[in-house]
Amino acid sequence: MTYSLAGQTITAPDTGGHGLDMSHGQDWLVEDCLIDLSACPLDQLDEAVGVVWGSSAVFRRCVIRGAGKLVLCGSGDTDKLNVERGKTVIFEDCILEDFGRRGPEAQSGMRIMLRGCLIRNWGAPDRFDVRSFASWAHHGGSIEAVDCVFDQPRAWRGWHIMVRDWLAHLGQAWNDEGLRGLLRPANWLPGVCRGLVATAGGQVRAENCHATRWWIRLEGHRGPHMSRSQAQALMARLENMR
């Protein structure tokens, strides 16, 4: 059975702290929805969207914004690995913006496909908790981005955030891979630079994508990049969805 949601606006979390909680093997189709948790205190939130425990989802023409942790695909629970492995979450013509991290994050063997999406302003100062990144795959998760734009308004977020973020990423690298993780140059990147990255057994792939800043890292990119004019046209088209 597929659960459908269309034309809805979500501005507050459920009792579990999620804007939209997809779990227990549910399949979802979400179209033309706004999930905006920017008015909610971070301590009242978990993810804006969580797709876990054997669920899958397709998002079309949605705007998801304003959470510390935006989109998590895969719970990381070892007892759920068998039901999560191979499940797919697709984002088509979506905007993911103004968040701290997980825009999106894939783990536990889950697969994310980004098609014609805008990922913008991760590590937003008012949504930052412990570290920041946009799209991250690890522990068997994978992310494929095609025709997407990764946009950051600025690199510097203040000493307090930058130092906390950098130390938290090094701590995560140590927790995931030990000394080997600390020896990987990519693990020393500040979060604001992490547009599309994979560590600790994750995989990422990109085609015809564009980073608006030279310092935004897009790993696994194959073939020519989207031009600046094409990126501006895509962003304008997506903005017209609002």
Predicted regions and their residues:
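All-beta strand scaffolds that present successive hydrophobic residues in beta-strands
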Residues: 3-7, 28-32, 57-59, 89-92, ...
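Feature marks extracellular polysaccharide-active and adherence modules
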Residues: 6, 11-13, 23, 31, ...
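Extracellular beta-strand/beta-solenoid scaffold signature
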Residues: 13-22, 41-52, 66-83, 98-105, ...
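A generic "binding-loop/recognition-motif" signal
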Residues: 16, 26, 55, 100, ...
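Extracellular structured ligand-interaction cores
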Residues: 46, 59, 91, 101, ...
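Solenoidal tandem-repeat scaffolds enriched in leucines and small polar residues
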Residues: 87, 110, 122-123, 141
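Short, charged low-complexity linker/loop segments at the C-terminal edge of domains
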Residues: 156, 212-215
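Short, low-complexity, Pro/Ser/Thr/Gly-rich segments in the mature regions of secreted, periplasmic
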Residues: 238-240
